[in-house]
Amino acid sequence: MKSGRFIGVMSGTSLDGVDVVLATIDEHRVAQLASLSWPIPVSLKQAVLDICQGQQLTLSQFGQLDTQLGRLFADAVNALLKEQNLQARDIVAIGCHGQTVWHEPTGVAPHTLQIGDNNQIVARTGITVVGDFRRRDIALGGQGAPLVPAFHHALLAHPTERRMVLNIGGIANLSLLIPGQPVGGYDTGPGNMLMDAWIWRQAGKPYDKDAEWARAGKVILPLLQNMLSDPYFSQPAPKSTGREYFNYGWLERHLRHFPGVDPRDVQATLAELTAVTISEQVLLSGGCERLMVCGGGSRNPLLMARLAVLLLGTEVTTTDAVGISGDDMEALAFAWLAWRTLAGLPGNLPSVTGASQETVLGAIFPANS
């Protein structure tokens, strides 16, 4: 069973940067050593957003984007290696999630697509890469997501305390760590995605820092109820979603019925949408004693305050409080999944994804020995 230093690379639906984490991993523990966030050029970010909202590309344009993202991920890894004074030979493997551009796990031909050519990463770093983590689970009838609950269970489950882990990235997802029950998990709906999209269009800001805009506005209750009527929110688990569904076009369709509203009121309503849809799912899943929050949304004071109010009796905290960086959680999870793949261990949980069986995940892109 291979153990040693692994690197995890994650570029999530928020597109707020490439998260890169260095960790030592073996069968007994995961210890984070270092991390960095690598910027995504505006042109690449916009190209990904365009695909996610259905804009057509030629095969040439798509291939170029795949290559450019692979090079970007390699640059991020090399920056971390340089910062830590490490060589390629010091790393067992890289676990790279890739950039999701489409996720459609139901229908006649279920599929998910993450791009960022792993061959580019191997060639530019000299390190073995494990990637393409989601499609095996989909091939076995699963959603291909979320995959992180298995990692949350390994690190954060408690023998007697009812715990849940909430990741608020572009999409919010919940891991159910309930003693005596199979691990559960699913996407609750939009996390930061709609809030970020709205303030970007209205004020040219990548996100609502400290929820300043949202706190200056008032929740538009009819708009909130209109958005809450979306069938995704009442759909039973297992379920997963992404930017191809909850995007700016989705928001525009709901806003057509509310012309002339104050942009700050819309921001406040979107924050409330995220808080309400999360809290409803926590309660529908039986509630918990402790909700541990990670991801960019854990730094949104309004979201955290609203969750505490909506979930009275639950201790709402961050994963940082238990010693795991909320910013690095997902990248760390894919380093761990790479370790499991190389060890020949399953990485999915059928109780979470709905797959017909446990399976080893991903494809291995070996470096030259």
Curated annotation (Swiss-Prot):
Gene from which this protein is expressed: anmK
Signal peptide: none
Keywords: ATP-binding, Carbohydrate metabolism, Kinase, Nucleotide-binding, Transferase
Pathway(s) annotated for this protein in UniProt: Amino-sugar metabolism; 1,6-anhydro-N-acetylmuramate degradation; Cell wall biogenesis; peptidoglycan recycling
Pfam families: AnmK
Natural source organism: Shigella flexneri serotype 5b (strain 8401)
Name the UniProt record assigns to this protein: Anhydro-N-acetylmuramic acid kinase
Top class in the EC scheme: transferase
Catalytic activities: 1,6-anhydro-N-acetyl-beta-muramate + ATP + H2O = N-acetyl-D-muramate 6-phosphate + ADP + H(+)
